Amino acid sequence: MYTKYEQTAHYIRQFITERTPEFSIILGSGLSPLQDEVTPIMEIPYAGIPNFPQSTVEGHGNKLIYGTLSGKYVLLMSGRFHYYEGYPMDAVTFPIRIFHLLGIKKLIVSNASGGVNPNFSVGDIMLIRDHINLFPEHPLRGRNLEKFGTRFPDMSQAYDCQMIDLAETIAMEQGTPLQKGVYVGLQGPTFETPSEYGMVRAIGGDAVGMSTVPEVIVARHQGMRVFALSIISDLGGKDISPNVSHTEVLNAVNATMPKVLALVREFVKRSK
């Protein structure tokens, strides 16, 4: 498997014609407008990258964008891979391994998620401070690749506290209300039942979604700093029947997008 990682990294490296990116950024459902904030140097379609999967979900692109954002070099992933698409975990997290081999030290992850905290509203931005992994397969299951990290990585600070503090400071300056909470990862593809939403809340979750957790686990396994945010695209609970659709999720994300863009632009600019 490591040979495949090296082969893919070697292919992508030829397109990184200037400085090594400081950030890798993964765009979630409906968050494609963020790619318009990047001044592109090179676009790399997934279809041409050796060993790379393809995203099949509406609202997700299928390319890497190497360029600059707020004066920093970034490698942006327009379209992620989900466990519910039928991919094994090593495919879902394949790009994260490549980011590490390219020398990228920081990861920004975004998603749209369902809110279960009664204090949340549709359109809220939630900074992820921790997660609960309820995926049926662990991304580090199997033989450990020592070149990436230890067999038993620590996850007590999966999400970088300094990055969270910076985002909170910026949001306060911009007048953007933020939530902060625990993201629960489920495999999907069905949206949760009211009872499942209730379970998520009962075990300590504030929001629930179908991505992010595997990517973060692998990023931390190899020592990357991680910052993650969710847009609350719908609400659910044991006494709420949300009747949510993917179109409604995308609409909620679009309405919040200007605030997200402003936050991410300044975050990248000021991050150290």
Specify the residue positions occupied by each region the protein language model found.
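Generic non-transmembrane alpha-helical segments
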Residues: 11, 15-18, 162, 166-177, ...
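Metabolite-binding pocket within alpha/beta catalytic cores that recognizes anionic/polar moieties
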Residues: 1-155
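His/Asp/Glu-rich mid-to-C-terminal helical/loop segments that flank catalytic regions of hydrolases
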Residues: 236-272
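Active-site/ligand-binding-proximal alpha/beta "capping" segment
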Residues: 164, 170-206, 264
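Non-catalytic positions within long, well-ordered alpha-helices that form the structural scaffold/packing
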Residues: 100-103, 201, 220
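Zn-dependent metallopeptidase/amidohydrolase metal-coordination segment
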Residues: 210-248
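Short acidic/polar active-site loop segments enriched in Thr and Asp
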Residues: 105-106, 206, 225
